């Protein structure tokens, strides 16, 4: 039986999470992509807490965007999460694409975070 797209993403995400782990020195930049929005969190897996987060559902970001499901919106989230991480003193992260392919909105978020100063 063929897997649905959602099942494929979940299976890929479980496989990736076995290898990708965030530490206090090098936390994990986790990306979740839904049909309408995109979310990014910088997570310390050892301490089990979120250091910084950004998404297209935030009111100030939502007002400036025409849609939360575009590459432009993803780039804005990437830039915002990078700025918040740098304010917390985080420069080096591990990228967790959340089982999604590194293409389109996920790639736009990663590129914007790199341009804003995060290293991964």
Swiss-Prot record:
Coiled coil, from the record: none
Highest taxon of source: Bacteria
CDD domains named in the record: Ribosomal_L18_L5e (cd00432)
Single GO term (MF): 5S rRNA binding
CC terms in the record's Gene Ontology section: cytosolic large ribosomal subunit
InterPro entries: Ribosomal_uL18_bac-type, Ribosomal_uL18_bac/euk
SUPFAM superfamilies: Translational machinery components (SSF53137)
Alphabetical UniProt keywords: Ribonucleoprotein, Ribosomal protein, RNA-binding, rRNA-binding
Statement: the UniProt record of this protein carries the keyword Disulfide bond: no
HAMAP family xref list: Ribosomal_uL18_B (MF_01337_B)
Family: Belongs to the universal ribosomal protein uL18 family.
Assembly and binders: Part of the 50S ribosomal subunit; part of the 5S rRNA/L5/L18/L25 subcomplex. Contacts the 5S and 23S rRNAs.
Function field: This is one of the proteins that bind and probably mediate the attachment of the 5S RNA into the large ribosomal subunit, where it forms part of the central protuberance.
Name of the protein in question: Large ribosomal subunit protein uL18
Organism: Rippkaea orientalis (strain PCC 8801 / RF-1)
